[in-house]
Amino acid sequence: MGSDLKARLKAKFSRRSSTSGSVKSGHSHSHGETQLSQRDESRSLASTDNHSRPASVRLDPQSSSNLGAPAPAPDADEVPVRIVISPEDSTATSSSTASTLPSEEVQPQESVTRDPSSQLSAAPKRRAASDGPGNDLHHPMAATTSSLASINENQTLVDASIAASPPATKLPPSVSTSARNTAASSAAAAAAASAAVAVTAAAAAADPDNDDDDDDHLDPLHRGPAASDVLTPAPATAPAPVPATLSASSIARPTGPPRRQSLLPNRQDALIKTLLQAANINEADLTADHLLSINANMVTRKIWVKRAGASATLITINEDDLVDDVRDMILKKYTNSLGRHFDAPDLTLRIFPREERQERLLGPEEPMGRTIDAYFPGGQTVDEALVIDIPTRRTPRPSPRGAVSHPTAVYYAHDTGRPSEAGEGYFPPVGAIPSPNLEVPGAAPNGGPPPPHAIHIQHTGHLPHSISILGTGQVPPIPSPGRSHAYKTRPNRPQLGRTHTSSPTFINGVPSNVGGPPTAHPVHSSFHPRLPPSRTQSNASAESAAIVPPAPPLATPPAPEIPSAIQRISTPPPRIASPRPSSARPARKKIAPAHPVLPAGMLAGGVPPINVLIVEDNPINLKLLEAFVKRLKVRWKTAMNGRDAVKKWKGGGFHLVLMDIQLPIMNGLDATKEIRRLERVNSIGVFSSSASGVFSGSVTSEPEGTEGDIEDKDRLANIELFKSPVIIVALTASSLQSDRHEALAAGCNDFLTKPVNFVWLERKVMEWGCMQALIDFDGWRQWKDFAQDAEENDAAKKAAGVKAKSKKNRLSVTTAAA
């Protein structure tokens, strides 16, 4: 009986070993060698004497005494499983004990007594104990990589490998043996298979009559999944393997499409750089190719500049601009005051450092941004603005006390009171002081003695008064525009007192020409301190007693210490060629204005009172033109659009039309074309049939042939009032040459650009009035009489109004007294 059971067990063990090897080889090819080494070590431990084994795998005396003896049949509910685990290395002991494979000489190391009926019921319990994902105490890969440390191995390496593995959780003693087996390391897959073989051998020994059923029940090929469910815990879902190191390319930002337009303005380069640098702080490896290149002209800043004694202003410059570039920006900011008169290279910039250092001029090659940062580290304030210097005008001033080589140059030689270019005013704020050089030679043109200023040249030796005579030899007379005798009245203005080392002292009256006629030359006398005593005092008393000239009508207030003779001598002299003091006196009553105008009554007496038609849609401009023509004492009528202008022109009697181009209903050009068409149809002016024989050909025959064909709407009622074509002047705000050509082509005689210069327009009115007078001389005579009668009537009406007003005032006074 015992020998038969032993033979059957050997056959089963041999079959199980082959089956277990095939199952283990199916897990992983890479762990086959590890399982073979574990098997050899287990055999060596099994064949070793119990006293020679390590303490962790040594069997207790009871288990060692029962080796090789058949186990008694246990009870139905008692399945004791006893495993000796050393507390020092529980994982290694479990692996070494469970991975021991049976052989002919090796006995089971665990005393397992299990009933066949309870074997099936234990499987669900073990399955339930290993269901949770947290019950697996080891990594699922550790089951194939863990191996039993041999006796001859280096224990330090084994301990290092154990320390590298996750720590095992110690279970309390109340946990069952199956739970402890489940909580063991998942690296003991081979040990679980050996335990299954031991349990099968014990069951076969208990029931020897059920061999075939046991073989089928314990066959791993038939119940492979069940055996793994019973003895192997379910591994938890393993996370995806994470590489230890990540490459920079794997986390680099993907390259998107190129940015076509920046979200920020191109001058905010500092902000763009800051944002890009802040975004790249946490980047692993971001190459420069992923970023857009930034232009240098995007960097801008503002600096303070000002003119000397003026308010400061800000200008925008680039970061890399030089001082020469900044000067261009300054001219753009100062467009009117500097840009009209100076170029950028003419300007200079001065900088005032914060320290007690001297100011300095900035060179055109210096970088503006770096200079500002160097001198003003904390930033430039408005009080530290750069000062803009402009070049001083190098116009040569006339040299004082110079000789004048031309008689008419005396007026310009003493014109020291002219307003300066800086604009201090027309009249300098100085009292009336007679100029010591105001001398006009009276006998020089007639071959008389030399003038007094020639003697002055001998004593002073100065250069001529005007620097312009160096090239021409004389100073040509340049009278004021529009005034033929303006040079005589201009010295009436107060003269600017010049302070020189040779300042003259005022003495009594001195004649400028001894022996000359006393009636023609007393006004030419002047004071001069350098004249010889014999010439300056010979006839002074006689002339001063004989001549007592009256004071001029518009003489300036004299100084209190200067006598009347000095006042008379300080008046300007008349023209040299015609010494007529009586005729020159009335001319002193008027001062030449900036724009010379005609006298108030000149048009009324010299030009016929023409009739003007004003066509303007703007009421303000219309009122201005009405006031203008009213001041000229001419007749006028107004129209607000082109259609009314044509309708009023048909009434006749107009000589001048001021036509605005931009008009409602009918514009100015269309109205002009209509007026010219009606003039041509009605044969007015040069189209008349009564013209000279030159127009007896085809030019005049056409109006004669078409005279009877004139429509009623085109026929003029008062044809006798149309003596000549009317003068049409276009008024427009456009200054384009094309608009001018278009207006002239439509039939306009002239073209005026708004705003209109009324002085120029007054002259044009006189010109156009003279043209009308030449065309119709008889009518002009009648118009003149009519104008005189109208003036007389107006004067009578004004006198009557004044008389009535005075009478009314007297009545009111008497009534109040009563």
From Swiss-Prot:
Residues 611-769 form the Response regulatory domain. InterPro entries: 2C_system_His_kinase, CheY-like_superfamily, Sig_transdc_resp-reg_receiver. The keyword Protein biosynthesis does not apply. Disruption phenotype: Increases the sensitivity to various stresses, including oxidative stress conferred by H(2)O(2) and sodium nitroprusside dihydrate. Confers higher resistance to fungicides such as fludioxonil and iprodione. Results in significant down-regulation of melanin biosynthesis-related genes but does not affect microsclerotial development. Impairs phosphorylation of HOG1 under the treatment of sorbitol. Severely attenuates fungal virulence on tobacco seedlings. CDD domains: REC_hyHK_CKI1_RcsC-like. The keyword Transmembrane helix does not apply. It is found in: Cytoplasm. The modification 4-aspartylphosphate is found at D660. One of its GO terms (biological process) is phosphorelay signal transduction system. Keywords: Cytoplasm, Phosphoprotein, Two-component regulatory system, Virulence. Pfam families: Response_reg. Its main location: cytoplasm. Two-domain response regulator protein in the two-component signal transduction system of the HOG1 pathway. Modulates stress response, melanin biosynthesis and virulence via its regulation of the phosphorylation of HOG1. This is Response regulator SSK1. It comes from Verticillium dahliae (strain VdLs.17 / ATCC MYA-4575 / FGSC 10137). The lineage of its organism: Eukaryota, Fungi, Dikarya, Ascomycota, Pezizomycotina.
